[in-house]
Amino acid sequence: RGEIIRIRGNKAQMQIFEMTQGIKAGDTVDLIGDLLCAELGPGLLGQTFDGLQNPLPLVAEKAGFFLERGVYVDSLPRDKKWDWTPTAKPGDKVVRGDSIGSVPEGPFTHKILVPFDLLGMYTVKSVTPAGSYTIEDTVAVVTDEKGNDHQLKMAFKWPVKRAVDCYAERLAPSEPMVTQVRLIDTFYPVSKGGTYCIPGPFGAGKTVLQHTTSRNADVDIVIIAACGERAGEVVETIKEFPELKDPRTGRSLMERTIIICNTSSMPVASREASVYTSVTLAEYYRQMGLHVLL
């Protein structure tokens, strides 16, 4: 898979997300006409994805531990049923990003949102009653201002390079994010909605500090974007994170964590995609009102 980045006359320039060995002049290219998208819905927490949002454990089951080109797996489980509880009712007015219901996902209430690409005001026509449904089942039908009906499901896709802008204005950071690392909280405080960095040479303890912050920070969701790191560090992250205990619940920290990993040996375009995918997932949970540490 690749992405067209420039068109000049009758020639298109592409960046490829996978290895290009064996590709030669004269090979056929199929244009699917879609942007690189992330699938958003219940079932993301606890997953380990690559930059294209393929669940790596399922890819390993399908094709082995060495990634092959052209192997793609659904990002979210199609057969798992979720306990749907509607909150919207017929006649309600909704816009993109509004919640129409919820399902439990781990320790959180996962809000089912109106897809971000539905522009304008919509009227709820019907809502599926509470029960167990898959992400491919229709949970509501809304009508746009022209009278056209749109079926809403629990999951939808969104281009990773488009910001999730379903808000009126960005609030200025004013509340501290307590990391429980006294050195950071005292001398280098971090605010919710802000950014910070951990610079340092090899072996300085950047990954250890990252794990400590992820485990103890005053946040709801943790998303790890292991982009362009050495394979050893990525393997260390994948192995150690499921073993970390959440101090709030005493259970695995992975229950509220998502890992997106692309090692330094992957193509540059793939590593870039992992950053955009991670940010998109973080913005999705932010839209639910949750605090996300990326």
Where in the sequence are the language-model features?
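Peripheral, non-AAA+ core regions of ATP-driven protein-machinery
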Residues: 1-187
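Switch/coupling sub-region of P-loop NTPases
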Residues: 177-294
